[in-house]
Amino acid sequence: MKKIGILFGMENTFPPAFVEKINSMKVEGVEAEFVKIGGIRMDESKKYDVIIDRISQDIQFYRAYLKNAALHGTIVVNNPFWWTADDKFFNYSLAHKLGVAIPPTVILPHNKHPEGTTDRSMRNLMFPLNWQELFDYVGFPAFLKPYSGGGWKHVYKVHTPEEFFHHYNQTGDLCMTLQRGVEFDEYYRCYVVGQEKVHIMKYDPKAPHHERYVKGNPPPSSAALRDRMEKDALTLCRALGYDLNTVEFAVERSVPYAIDFLNPAPDAEITSVGQENFDWIVNAAAEMAVKMALSGESPVKEMRWAGFLAGNNPPNAEKPTRKAKKVK
């Protein structure tokens, strides 16, 4: 029996719907359940063929468990080794090299010394910093935000150097980036599943959290824009090796700038994404997990971004599948 598990935290709707969907498909030899674990031996035998990870970014014990599970043959979505190493600034740099539109972005030294360090730890750091050069490169308005992490925490829109320093001086020992603000006239969040399927959702980041997914999900303003977002979303997720992710695009003058694409446990609660988007992600994720369980593929894939930089394009990036197949 092939067993699929889901590891989750505070979510209430996606995990049970995911399990129910897989079991209702009645695929011979495949079943799904909530992951149940205790203390883990280093030689723990494989209990799950596939695990969908929704929580290990917040709980170190789970992340360590998933790495060990992968070592013993479990396919983990998303790859716990790369997820541990990844950060948004690297992603911006990689995306830029891959030809995806990215606003000018810089990474900044910590405003305060990280715990356990002093000024002697910073002797390689230029002082004073070349602030004007950085401001000239990025431009204003700009967004000051952590180099990693999510949930719109510690994100500040700044219009002048004075506003920048006001907020930067409150960031403590967080490592921050400064990125040119995109004056967007359209904004989209895209689910990407299995590095194959893309679901574009009209999104309003300025609205209250429960109203950000625009009702009725109006389509992009042009077919060319839709195709560009699908292609770029697949390019990013294939390069980074993420099988479940969201990619956000802020569209300025018909150019989709990739703003946020490090979301390996993307929001999938029905209360925020709405029924139509919820149904899509449940179906697509369930089909992906079943396909993986039956595939017998290697649990840990090599990172492919290095090959892309060498000129090897993501396969079939120009032909994304837009909709998950309907499961009867």
Go through each PLM region and give its residues.
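Phosphate-binding core of ATP-grasp and ATP-grasp-like enzymes
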Residues: 172-175, 181-215, 230-246, 250-257, ...
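A short acidic/glycine-rich loop-to-helix N-cap element
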Residues: 270-277
